[in-house]
Amino acid sequence: MPSMDIVSETDLEEVRNAVDNANREITTRFDFRGVEASFEWKKPNIILKAEGDFQLKQMCDLLRSQLAKRNVDAKAMAVGDASASGRNWSQQVTFKEGIEQDMAKQLVKLIKGEKLKVQAAIQGEQVRVTGKKRDELQAVMQLVRTAELEQSFQFTNFKD
């Protein structure tokens, strides 16, 4: 009986590479000349530091574009509130790992709502989907990809 797992993982090595590339790009950008701005990689978080709120927003967009180049979904990125201390601003970015219980329930409800001949079960931080045919699992994969959920999902452990 074919089965697969739906998980939500982020490749932290690719995130680190994106942070390094973003730091390099900031040093060469004209709008950041003479400004103290940096990305700090504190696994699994990133701390953005700049002299102004507007620059933090630009840095966040820059980070998103670098993540997209490295094939890391920006939905996995959770941006915190900007905080000021003196003349410096900082903002923390975290990455969602695993599927929370509420999201897993929403995912199972979505799959069962399509009336496909599959069973979906929550197993910790992942959702196991089993069906009689491989085509049904592929239909579930397509359904999850097209659904407007605020988290990115990957499909692993595909067994025939």
UniProtKB/Swiss-Prot annotation:
This is Nucleotide-binding protein CPS_1098. Gene3D superfamilies: 3.30.70.860, YajQ-like, domain 2. One of its GO terms (molecular function) is nucleotide binding. SUPFAM superfamilies: YajQ-like. GO terms for cellular component: cytosol. It comes from the Bacteria. Nucleotide-binding protein. InterPro entries: DUF520, UPF0234-like_C, UPF0234_N, YajQ-like_sf. The keyword Transmembrane helix does not apply. It holds the Pfam family DUF520. Belongs to the YajQ family. Keywords: Nucleotide-binding. The keyword Nucleotide-binding applies.
